[in-house]
């Protein structure tokens, strides 16, 4: 047994190999060429096979989620190019290929170039929908970029002439395969944009092998399509063929005939629609005329047509009423505005010290006026009461009695009113008050009304 060497289990060694392979970026995205053997298509959709060459072989699996996109059926003995990742299947301790894509060998280099260019252009945004231009609703000037001798031009031209004969077609002849084809196609697209006047471009060719269609997978053609200000329909190959040009073009057609159908409307269908719209317009016009005629007849029978002068007078009266209402409304608005202004001024004055002082002074003046008025009224009431009291006193006043010939006797010294002879003595001096003065008298004789003799005069 080795001195200090660690002793590993099979699982530990297998796990170490798995991590080592997973850390190698080359093995996580690798392209491999080989021959298929031991091929088995499982009922669940997965494909199991061995990929081998003259010197080695490797187990491989392609899960159903990936192999459903294959456009061919893998078989034993078929040479293929596979893209995938290498990893270790721990239970068996063996490494194997987990395939993601597969193509028949012979076109492997082209397919690899296709995938790399597609990925790069997609990252640049050449395939984004927001960059695509809408097709014109009716294209009258159409340029066709294709071979002048191929089936594509015949299919496109015959379809457009059948569907929309008024369209003007211009053929821009190009090479559609070979080394010079990409330059020829890109140049024609640029020339069409420089010349101008075209509503639409159709760029394409008929079907063929991937090598024959390869010009439409070149970056030069893709960028010419992307830079075109004229909308472009791509029509390359058959329905199952997809080229880089299809992804960049504004619209992709499955076939050249399909491109022609997308480019122009069907004139017969347009005529049919026009006829339908014409009939609908006629019916609508007839219905409108009918309604207008009925309306006119109602107007002719109306009061306005029969008595126009009265109607004018009535409208003048209504106008006067409206003007009066408007004037009142205007005055009311002005009055309301003045009221609001007064309220604001009042509120402003209330919160302003000068306004408060003036308000207090006004209140004082008002209070003073009120007090004077109240005092005046009180004096008037008191005077009235006094006059009433005087009148009452006058009714009881001795003066009134004296006016009838009576006099009031008073003692001269004490001014005591004499009500009885018993209050007087002989030789007392008396004052007799009459209405217009008084008399000074001396008592010489005293008689009692009882007829008796005078009382003691001492």
Swiss-Prot record:
Reactions performed catalytically: Exonucleolytic cleavage in either 5'- to 3'- or 3'- to 5'-direction to yield nucleoside 5'-phosphates
Q: What class of enzyme is it?
A: hydrolase
Output the superkingdom of the source species. Answer: Bacteria
GO annotations of cellular component type? cytoplasm; exodeoxyribonuclease VII complex
Primary place of residence?
cytoplasm
Record-linked NCBIfam families: xseA
What the protein does comes down to: Bidirectionally degrades single-stranded DNA into large acid-insoluble oligonucleotides, which are then degraded further into small acid-soluble oligonucleotides.
Q: Which family does it belong to?
A: Belongs to the XseA family.
- The protein depicted here goes by the name Exodeoxyribonuclease 7 large subunit
Q: Which organism is it from?
A: Halalkalibacterium halodurans (strain ATCC BAA-125 / DSM 18197 / FERM 7344 / JCM 9153 / C-125)
């Amino acid at each position: 047994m080795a001195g200090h060497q660690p002793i590993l289990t099979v699982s530990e060694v297998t796990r170490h190999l798995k991590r080592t392979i997973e850390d190698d970026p080359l093995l996580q995205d690798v392209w491999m060429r080989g021959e298929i053997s031991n091929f088995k298509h499982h009922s669940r959709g997965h494909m199991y096979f061995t990929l081998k060459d003259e010197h080695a072989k490797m187990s491989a699996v392609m899960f159903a989620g990936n192999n459903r996109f294959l456009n061919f059926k893998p078989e034993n003995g078929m040479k293929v190019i596979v893209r995938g990742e290498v990893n270790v299947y721990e239970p068996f301790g063996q490494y194997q290929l987990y395939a993601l894509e597969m193509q028949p060998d012979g076109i492997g280099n082209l397919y690899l170039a296709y995938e790399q260019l597609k990925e790069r252009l997609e990252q640049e945004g050449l395939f984004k929908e927001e960059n695509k231009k809408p097709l014109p609703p009716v294209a009258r000037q159409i340029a066709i970029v294709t071979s002048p001798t191929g089936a594509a031009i015949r299919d496109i031209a015959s379809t457009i002439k059948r569907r929309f004969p008024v369209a003007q077609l211009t053929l821009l002849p190009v090479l559609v395969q070979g080394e010079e084809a990409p330059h020829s196609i890109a140049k024609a697209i640029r020339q069409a944009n420089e010349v101008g006047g075209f509503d639409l471009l159709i760029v394409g060719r008929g079907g063929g092998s991937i090598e024959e269609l390869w010009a439409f997978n070149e970056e030069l053609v893709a960028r010419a399509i992307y830079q075109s200000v004229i909308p472009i329909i791509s029509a390359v190959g058959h329905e199952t063929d997809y080229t880089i040009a299809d992804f960049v073009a504004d619209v992709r057609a499955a076939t050249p005939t399909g491109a022609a159908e997308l480019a122009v409307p069907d004139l017969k269908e347009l005529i049919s629609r026009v006829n339908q719209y014409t009939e609908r317009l006629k019916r609508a016009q007839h219905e409108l005329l009918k309604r207008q005629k009925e309306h006119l007849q109602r107007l002719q029978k109306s009061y306005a047509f029969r008595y126009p002068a009265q109607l004018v007078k009535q409208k003048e009266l209504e106008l006067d009423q409206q003007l009066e209402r408007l004037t009142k409304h205007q005055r009311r608005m002005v009055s309301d505005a003045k009221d609001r202004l007064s309220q604001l001024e009042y509120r402003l004055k209330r919160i302003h010290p000068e306004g408060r002082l003036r308000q207090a002074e006004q209140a004082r003046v008002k209070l003073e006026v009120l007090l004077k008025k109240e005092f005046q009224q009180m004096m008037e009431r008191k005077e009235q009461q006094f006059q009433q009291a005087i009148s009452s006193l006058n009714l009881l006043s001795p003066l009134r009695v004296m006016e009838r010939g009576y006099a009031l006797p008073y003692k001269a010294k004490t001014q005591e009113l004499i009500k009885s002879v018993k209050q007087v003595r002989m030789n007392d001096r008396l004052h007799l008050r009459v209405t217009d003065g008084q008399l000074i008298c001396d008592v010489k004789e005293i008689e009692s009304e009882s007829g008796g003799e005078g009382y003691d005069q001492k």
